[in-house]
Amino acid sequence: MNVVSQDVFKAGSAFSGGVTRHGETCGALLGAIMAIGALMGRERLPDKEQSQKAMVPATRVYDAFKEKIGHTLCSEIHKIRHGKAYRLYIPEEKKAFHDAGGHGPEGCPVVCGTAARIAAEVILDLKESSSK
């Protein structure tokens, strides 16, 4: 399996806070799925077969994340972890999110770590399967 380019990380920079801090799909989940796509996805648009091959492990990541975290939307994850959704694009609410522990031990670091762990497990399973 190829090593993922640093450009992939750069490309995902605006995913935080549920895509540009708007509470949509969790950026950590998107990053985990991007890692699967970077390793297994198609290289050319017409290659639908390869695209479909990436869907199976990407779906595993999505389903496991939703099961462990409780939701895939950043705003809903806020509610689960902090009791309310924060609009992170509003400076006062972003500060309130930080004050509520948004980046503390039970906040985003746990969510990001969970997404990374799930992606790593799926990637290791793929690597093991391909070496058999």
Residue ranges: model-predicted function:
Residues 55-132:
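C-terminal binding/interaction regions
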Residues 3, 24, 107, 111:
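Short, contiguous, pocket-lining structural segments
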Residues 9-13, 33, 113:
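Short amphipathic alpha-helical segments
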Residues 34-41, 117-121:
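Short glycine/serine- and small hydrophobic-enriched flexible loop segments
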Residues 1-10, 38-60:
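Phosphate-handling active-site elements
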Residues 15-24, 48, 99-106:
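A short glycine/serine-rich beta->alpha loop
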Residues 20-34:
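Conserved phosphate/anionic-ligand binding catalytic regions in large, soluble enzymes, centered on
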